[in-house]
Curated annotation (Swiss-Prot):
One of its GO terms (molecular function) is UDP-N-acetylmuramate-L-alanine ligase activity. One of its GO terms (cellular component) is cytoplasm. This is UDP-N-acetylmuramate--L-alanine ligase. PANTHER family: UDP-N-ACETYLMURAMATE--L-ALANINE LIGASE, UDP-N-ACETYLMURAMATE--L-ALANINE LIGASE-RELATED. One of its GO terms (biological process) is peptidoglycan biosynthetic process. It catalyses: UDP-N-acetyl-alpha-D-muramate + L-alanine + ATP = UDP-N-acetyl-alpha-D-muramoyl-L-alanine + ADP + phosphate + H(+). Gene3D superfamilies: Mur ligase, C-terminal domain (3.90.190.20), Mur-like, catalytic domain (3.40.1190.10), NAD(P)-binding Rossmann-like Domain (3.40.50.720). Keywords: ATP-binding, Cell cycle, Cell division, Cell shape, Cell wall biogenesis/degradation, Cytoplasm, Ligase, Nucleotide-binding, Peptidoglycan synthesis. It is found in: Cytoplasm. Cell wall formation. It comes from Rickettsia africae (strain ESF-5). Belongs to the MurCDEF family.
């Protein structure tokens, strides 16, 4: 960033172009650079919430990728999701315009800051938001670059005035190990992104490097309720590690006396850190979001706050302003007194956590859980097919659509229908159904929804757009639906 800063100060402002600027990771970095005073523009195939937000700031957005989009740019930023045959990449190579990976640009933003990097197979986005909440409660004003829209900010990234930067660290292509973080959080490690890593051990090795690459004065925060994370922590001696959990009695930070309701969770925390607070109990911490997994996410934030000496008051009250993250158990509508939830869960472990939360709420309301799941990527389904057969136990009624390709080519035998057939044949669920078209979900809701039910629409594809359009879809059939967000 020093070279960019020099150019921004002493020369004509040069333009940074983002290919795929509407992506949640790319849009956040673009917004931060824009707020720092750089000239930013970008392109994407379709308009979305992120492109509209950036355009409202005055950032030039091109719809579609074309050589002429980069006529007057000095740098091009890409993510690993961009095809090397993209015409803008080819043009940049032809004109010898520097091409910068998204992770490298993030690293430059973090280099001169005290940075907190949040990684793990699941829970990164919510944990990043919760960490930011505690920093703000402590009177600090961090820069935040998140992997999801923070509801009370209406953005996934915002510029702060302090020397702290909190970022979600994407592990999908191993670039996260090069991020110059001071504090590293690992929420969990599950088999994911095996199309890149090829095997689970290589993925675990990347998380090991994520910790060991920390400076000697930094520290890691790890959830040892997760057995793979526990083993990793046990094997690392060269860096300071603060542990947390619910079931792990030897963790430095433990949640207990847990009470949950439809919209929140309350718990006590036991802290056992001799060099910080000694053994201390903080009572009645409340997070305004349900779910055991979210309690674990909050413990990661609490661990950071304790190590940085935020104080008991900030830690106890720090989550009061947390309003959640879009697509993380987001209630989007009500139909026939049933709640319709939009959730990003697309991995078996995420699905289990989401449905467990829904089941707990439905039981208290004498309702049932209706799960509508859109699988995401053929490669993920292929690698985790057996795990997908076992992850829907908390759904009373299950519907699975075909796979959202996300740019991948089909794989023979890997389909949503095949998954339903295997689940049914092996009797893992007695009410599993295949939805040939996502639009058929409207009929599912009309036929099944009753008072107290939780209708969970899950996936990383276009099922979210569908969930947010339900009011119009139901109205077109003569049914009334109340939109919540």
């Amino acid at each position: 960033m020093l070279l960019l800063e020099l150019k921004k100060t002493n020369q004509t402002l040069e333009t940074i172009h983002f290919i795929g600027i509407g992506g949640v990771g790319m849009s956040g970095i673009a917004e931060i650079l824009y707020n720092l005073g750089y000239k930013v523009q970008g392109s994407d195939l379709v308009e979305n919430y992120n492109t509209k937000r950036l355009e409202s700031y005055g950032i030039k957005i091109f719809l579609g990728h074309a050589e002429q989009n980069i006529t007057n740019v000095s740098y091009v930023v890409i993510s690993s999701a961009i095809n090397p045959k993209n015409p803008e990449i080819k043009e940049a190579l032809e004109r010898k315009i520097p091409i910068i990976r998204r992770a490298d640009m993030l690293a430059e933003l973090m280099r001169l800051k005290c940075s907190v990097a949040v990684s793990g197979s699941h829970g990164k986005t919510t944990t990043t938001s919760l960490v930011a909440c505690l920093f703000e409660a402590a009177g600090l004003c961090p820069t935040v670059i998140n992997g999801g829209i923070i509801n009370n900010k209406s953005t996934n990234a915002y510029l702060g005035s302090s020397n702290y930067l909190i970022a979600e660290a994407d592990e999908s292509d191993a670039t996260f190990i090069h991020i110059p973080s001071t504090i590293a959080i690992i929420t969990n490690i599950d088999p994911e992104h095996l199309d890149y890593y090829r095997d689970f051990e290589t993925l675990i090795g990347a998380f090991r490097s994520f910790i060991t690459n920390l400076p000697f004065y930094g520290f890691a925060v790890c959830c040892i309720d997760h057995k793979i994370v526990r083993k990793l922590v046990d094997d690392i001696t060269e860096r300071k590690i603060v542990t947390y959990g619910i079931d792990s009695e030897d963790a430095h930070i433990i949640a207990f006396n847990i009470n949950t309701d439809i919209a929140s969770s309350t718990f006590d925390v036991k802290i056992s850190l001799p060099n910080v607070l000694g053994t201390t109990i903080i009572e009645k911490i409340t997070i305004p979001t349900p779910g055991r997994h979210n309690i674990l996410n909050s413990l990661a934030a609490i661990a950071v706050g304790i190590e940085l000496d935020f104080g008991i008051k900030a830690i106890k009250n720090g989550f009061n302003n947390f309003k959640g993250v879009k697509r993380r158990f987001t209630k989007v509508a009500e139909y026939n007194n049933a709640s319709i939830i939009d959730d990003y869960a697309h991995h078996p472990e995420e699905i289990k956590a989401t449905l467990a939360t829904a089941k707990n709420i439905a039981n208290k309301q004498n309702g049932k859980v209706i799960a509508i799941f859109q699988p995401h990527r053929y490669s993920r389904m292929q690698y985790l097919f057996d795990d997908f057969m076992f992850c829907f136990a908390d759904a009373d009624i299950l519907y699975i659509t075909d796979i959202y390709a996300a740019g991948e080519n089909p794989i023979e035998g890997i389909t949503g229908r095949n998954l339903v057939d295997k689940i049914t044949k092996r009797k893992h669920h007695d009410k599993a159904n295949f939805l040939a078209e996502l639009d058929d979900a409207v009929g599912v809701i009309i036929d099944n929804a009753a008072s107290g039910d939780m209708i969970i629409m899950m996936g990383a594809g276009n099922i979210s757009s569908f969930a947010n359009e339900l009011e119009g879809r139901l109205s077109s059939r003569g049914f009334s639906c109340h939109t919540v967000v």
